[in-house]
Amino acid sequence: MMSNTLPEQSVNTTLAPLPGQPDYPATWPADALNCAQIKQHLDAFQQWLGAAFDDGYTAEQLIEARTEFIDQLLQRLWIAAGFGDTPDTALVAVGGYGRGELHPLSDIDLLILSRKRLSEAQAQKVGELLTLLWDVKLEVGHSVRTLEECLLEGLSDLTVATNLIESRLLIGDVALFLELQKHIFSDGFWPSEKFFAAKVEEQNERHQRYHGTSYNLEPDIKSSPGGLRDIHTLQWVARRHFGATSLREMVGFGFLTEAERNELDECQHLLWRIRFALHLELNRYDNRLLFDRQLSVAQRLRYEGEGNEPVEHMMKDFYRVTRRVGELNQMLLQLFDEAILALTTDEKPRVLDDDFQLRGTLIDLRDETLFIREPQAILRMFYMMVRNRDITGIYSTTLRHLRHARRHLKQPLCYIPEARSLFLAMLRHPGAVSRGLLPMHRHSVLWAYMPQWSHIVGQMQFDLFHAYTVDEHTIRVLLKLESFAKEETRAKHPLCVDLWPRLSHPELILIAALFHDIAKGRGGDHSVLGAQDILKFAELHGLNSRETQLVAWLVRHHLLMSVTAQRRDIQDPEVIKQFAEEVQTENRLRFLVCLTVADICATNETLWNSWKQSLLRELYFATEKQLRRGMQSTPDMRERVRHHQLQALALLRMENIDEEALHHIWGRCRANYFVRHSPNQLAWHARHLLRHDLSKPLILLSPQATRGGTEIFIWSPDRPYLFAAVCAELDRRNLSVHDAQIFTTRDDMAMDTFIVLEPDGSPLSPDRHEAIRHGLEQAITQRTWQPPQPRRQPAKLRHFTVETEVNFLPTHTDRKSFLELIALDQPGLLARVGQVFADLGISLHGARISTIGERVEDLFIIATADRRGLNNLLQQEVRQRLTEDLNPNDKV
């Protein structure tokens, strides 16, 4: 005889409503079970959820209330559909709904379970029930399976098996449901060890999709490492092996201490609060904390502050919680490993010294009180991990003792002399970062060692440029630096691999990297504050004067090379001379270029490309030459022109060109043209110009990458708005301009060179060349300038603001002005800048384009029509026009 009594695993259907809560479905009259009224009740309940959350009810209370609400609704509808007294059928909650975790937009996953296939009439009833649920706008996922089908599907599909393991009977045949439970918890259905191994592999694959870190600036609350899924993994494994249905029951089985349970509860509470608030802000299910949602979620959670401070406070809490979850997850899965797979329990540990032993490949304490008695032993353990490649991690019980000792430290570890000696010895070892600093960071020992580190843990930056939090970025800088010692890195970073063995004391660059962003988030110039911090570190750790000066200089100037290469005219000898004067020595230069490359690569994986590589190489070798030549020496312009012409001529003579015609063309060009192009570029231009009718436009696209990008060369009668027209066409084709050299011959022909890249930072695909050439021909031959129709701003930029800044930089000449533009990146920006210059009768001679996330930081070399720098009045007019044009009142 079938019973409608629910088993003990079910949510209590007598859960009392919270004050002000709409009635539960169990109390509705029978005539309320129609589409219109159900939807009305659901809408009222959803609105109440938001109001109740804002009034201070916890996410736990409201999740329980929503789960109960949906439970009762489904029970009523199941009976109304005619299944109330039908044997051998059951309605089962699975997945997150089975766990009783229904956030405002969570899917409602259902299993319609039967002993044998449903009859046609039953199938029709199920279809009508599901249609009603969809009509009232519930997000319902469902499967209709027999008991046998459940077991067969579950055996072949880990996701199905997991859903079944956390299934919960809503209504129906209890005996049928218990039979399902009996089968899925039997040894024949996903044995415990097989299930554990599969879930660990699944978690590892999921972590890889997020680059192994929860510290992405737009994390997924559920799936990012350290997120809710990592807690679920622990629950699934414990449920399958121990039968534990809650964290509290895991304590009873001895695999979780009460303190660890409380910690996981705290972490889950914060993650649930953020996820609940996010769902209230959205209309469609999503668990990603994207930039455009972060501020509204933070404000809903009552984080305070000006501007983006609420976001930074919320995200710092989020990242710190995911760090704790990640560490607990690692430790507890290892404990499960020992209990379930029994891989190491029978192995006799190998003694390493008086304090440590090796269990398999994991380092283990021989005396569990060691870290409390001798805190410096914590550093001894990590130093041993650095020196011994056999050690791949920390044994679970030792990790538990480490966590306990870490919480009971009376002072930072760096105040202990032996700990300082061990830390420096670790930094001098080739595996210092990957086998020492990285695990120290993961287990919050870097925080325990350096008080300053605590300030940047979880510190985010609300922009599109930085992909990681400050601490995660710093660790990635350190890992990149360590990679320069490996030959396999040469293909991507040949210069740094060449320079690494020539660094005097490579540990110094690791110290500089640790501190280069340590002062972010404190207010003020983080480079200056970081340099002050490193002086204290150097004194405490006994660095000598020369070493101290080097690391402090590197921190103070860690942005110098990047800014100079990307935002200054590095083909100007004066720029090179000023940079060399700042650097002073070749040793500093070697350190700085390695730190700069690592910093760029670790900021955002999309930033590093062959264009940036070419800029830094060019700046490095030009500076090295300047340092060897001496500060008083500057290259002679006429000699450089002559040298480039002779080398280009040598290349062309191999092709039997008409030298008289060549000299006629070159005679029309000004000196700057020869200085700012390589002999190969000069030969390439000349080769095509000699075969061309010079009265007509010529457009060339380089077949191979030039300085990391594709070079576009344009020969055309000069006219106003030419630069604007070219940039508008390139923007229309979604190409990024990174460099422009604008020249006009003595008889007013434009000779313009653009370095362009695809959006992903690669040179242009050859199959696009012809279409781009044709588009540019049309653009430059138009008789009148027609500003392009403004395009919509990309969605990812709409929630960022960057105030437009126009700065005129100091210059050593009165023949040109250097304009630095900082503005919000936006479609058609270069064309609009070019239009302003043309409107004001200003000639553009060069441009260096740098896009940093949502910001553009561009350099323009400009002059008046009579080749003079801009006076104060004209500078002010340019500043006003650019500010007005790039800060429109209504963004499209």
From Swiss-Prot:
It comes from the Bacteria. Residues 711-790, 818-892 form the ACT domain. Uridylyltransferase (UTase) activity is inhibited by glutamine, while glutamine activates uridylyl-removing (UR) activity. Residues 1-15 have a biased composition (Polar residues). It holds the Pfam family NTP_transf_2. Keywords: Hydrolase, Magnesium, Multifunctional enzyme, Nucleotidyltransferase, Repeat, Transferase. Residues 470-592 form the HD domain. GO terms for molecular function: [protein-PII] uridylyltransferase activity; phosphoric diester hydrolase activity. CDD domains: ACT_ACR-UUR-like_2 (cd04899), ACT_UUR-like_1 (cd04900), HDc (cd00077), NT_GlnE_GlnD_like (cd05401). Its cofactor is Mg(2+). Residues 1-351 are annotated as: Uridylyltransferase. One of its GO terms (biological process) is regulation of nitrogen utilization. Residues 1-20 are annotated as: Disordered. InterPro entries: ACT-like_dom_sf (IPR045865), ACT_dom (IPR002912), HD/PDEase_dom (IPR003607), HD_domain (IPR006674), NT_sf (IPR043519), PII_UdlTrfase/GS_AdlTrfase (IPR013546), Polymerase_NTP_transf_dom (IPR002934), UTase/UR (IPR010043). Belongs to the GlnD family. This is Bifunctional uridylyltransferase/uridylyl-removing enzyme. It comes from Cronobacter sakazakii (strain ATCC BAA-894).
